[in-house]
Amino acid sequence: EVKLLESGGGLVQPGGSLLSCAASGFDFSRYWMSWARQAPGKGQEWIGEINPGSSTINYTPSLKDKFIISRDNAKNTLYLQMSKVRSEDTALYYCARLGYYGYFDYWGQGTTLTVSSE
């Protein structure tokens, strides 16, 4: 059974944060992986994707200067390093597997990141 489990969310102050996605039930090292998010009351926004060997990483242009996607195939884990997060980055963050037919075939449940200076 394919499972994707995100972690690292919660209430954070503006600045940096690290999200993780632990994968199981498939050969993680053979698949492209992706991050996406959905802010409250808004549609889903694709963040970026990474190829199996980490040699190709694509980002949504507006986010590429604040987010870094990486992976550790030995640990079956995908990462999203976020810098300069602000209140508008409050969202439910998901990881997803890109299937062989060019679409996302499995999604995690997501982890909620709430950015607040209070």
Curated annotation (Swiss-Prot):
InterPro entries noted in UniProt: Ig-like_dom, Ig-like_dom_sf, Ig-like_fold, Ig_sub, Ig_V-set, IgHV
UniProt KW keywords: Adaptive immunity, Immunity, Immunoglobulin
Domain Ig-like: from-to ranges: 1-111
Organism annotation: Mus musculus
Additional detail: This chain was isolated from an IgA myeloma protein that binds galactan.
Assigned GO CC terms: extracellular region; immunoglobulin complex
Cross-referenced Pfam families: V-set (PF07686)
UniProt superkingdom: Eukaryota
Protein name stated in the entry: Ig heavy chain V region X24
An MF annotation (GO) of this entry: antigen binding
GO process terms (BP): immunoglobulin mediated immune response
